[in-house]
Amino acid sequence: MAFMLSLLMALVLVSYGLGGSLGCYLSENHMLHAQKNLKLLARMNRLSPHSCLQDRKDFGLPRKMVEGSQLQKDQAISVLHEMLQQCFNLFHTERSSAAWDNTLLEQLCTGLHQQLDDLDARLGPLMGQKDSGMGRMGPILTVKKYFQGIHVYLKEKKYSDCAWEVIRVEMMRALSSSTTLQERLKKMGGNLNSP
């Protein structure tokens, strides 16, 4: 359950920036790119999601809040970085280029890359201090497993237009579903260990 909350936390961070004590590390630009990336994903729609209902799949992203998190600040930062990197890797491929409008895809990849650069510049020293920490390995592995499932799905579906549409909707759902967790973080004042 803690791993799934870690994944949800990353989605909150990607969509809305870090709340409370984590927010001081991110620039306004980082948060603007997060919102812009979500809008770009929405604009990338080429097919009606209804035409691809037979291709839907549950990739294991939890739909509701998990209570009682023990997620630490450094875990949240690591998960955010991994989510951004995996998203970038997913959309920055030759097969992805064939599926999407290249202008929108390039803007999305640029926005994700700018977020990664911003995180690296601001959080490099913080992440370097505990980079080998075992506490982050579980949440990071959960993110990698989630994206590995997405890559396997695309390969099984032979990178069809419907498969890419399912993935686009999945990424939209993942980013959009983080609103409740964001509100919880605001109520806790950024303390992820609060009840």
Swiss-Prot record:
Give the signal peptide, or none: 1-23
Compartment annotation: Secreted
The record's listing under InterPro entries reads:
4_helix_cytokine-like_core, Interferon_alpha/beta/delta
Carries keyword Disulfide bond?
Answer: yes
- Primary location recorded for the protein, binned into one broad class: secreted
Q: Does the keyword NAD apply?
A: no
Q: Where are the transmembrane segments?
A: none
- Which Pfam families has this protein been placed in? Interferon
Cited Gene3D superfamilies: 1.20.1250.10
One GO CC term of this entry? extracellular space
Q: Which GO terms of type biological process are on file? A: defense response to virus; female pregnancy
Query: Which Cys pairs are S-S linked?
Result: C52-C162, C87-C109
Q: Which CDD domains match?
A: IFab
Q: Which GO terms describe its molecular function?
A: cytokine activity; cytokine receptor binding; hormone activity
What does it do?
Answer: Paracrine hormone primarily responsible for maternal recognition of pregnancy. Interacts with endometrial receptors, probably type I interferon receptors, and blocks estrogen receptor expression, preventing the estrogen-induced increase in oxytocin receptor expression in the endometrium. This results in the suppression of the pulsatile endometrial release of the luteolytic hormone prostaglandin F2-alpha, hindering the regression of the corpus luteum (luteolysis) and therefore a return to ovarian cyclicity.
Family the entry assigns:
Belongs to the alpha/beta interferon family. IFN-alphaII subfamily.
Q: What is this protein called?
A: Interferon tau
Its gene name is IFNT
